[in-house]
């Protein structure tokens, strides 16, 4: 009896499972739109899972972190290219003068290659060009740069600030040439005035040819109506500027004695 009841229950279970079963053959001609209807709940549940959401958030954060430095590097590279373009355009403006300077003075040409680092060239082009013209007429400054770089830099600063350079460039050039002779002559004048007078003789052609006329010319220098020798006049002006020279900064007491010695000689 019990065996019959179990067999009947098994038959009922098979009947119910057979009526509710849905079989899709492998070679079925059913449209592909029906298949996602059965897969949609599974996929939606998979995307809504916390692990999947955390992974997607991590990927988004990693992408944003990696893209930010790349953008910054691109901006920096663009700014660097812009600066290089501006510097190249400024250098092209001075290329004709630099090519001539390369033939005349290669050392000065190498110094002019750093135009972008020169504040005077960027701030005032006219003053920079004037300074370059003055440097062409001052070969003594290039020699001074090799012997004493500190004094050369100080001389370059005085070029843009001296009113004599702006007003009268030839007088300034003559003054610069005389400055090479003045330190040795002033020391000689303090040590030995007689030797100082003899040292001045080679600089005056009139002294070599006619000593009497030379003495007469020295007396005429005291007369403001007389026509003086330009070289001697420039030298007298240089004697008046001695308190402002480097010699006066080193020894102020001896600097105040220089006009007295010059006045006694001339």
Curated annotation (Swiss-Prot):
InterPro entries: Seed_Storage_Prolamin (IPR051529), Zein (IPR002530). Residues 1-21 form the signal peptide. Keywords: Seed storage protein, Signal, Storage protein. One of its GO terms (molecular function) is nutrient reservoir activity. Pfam families: Zein. Zeins are major seed storage proteins. Belongs to the zein family. The alpha zeins of 19 kDa and 22 kDa account for 70% of the total zein fraction. They are encoded by a large multigene family. This is 22 kDa alpha-zein 8. It comes from Zea mays (Maize). The lineage of its organism: Eukaryota, Viridiplantae, Streptophyta, Embryophyta, Tracheophyta.
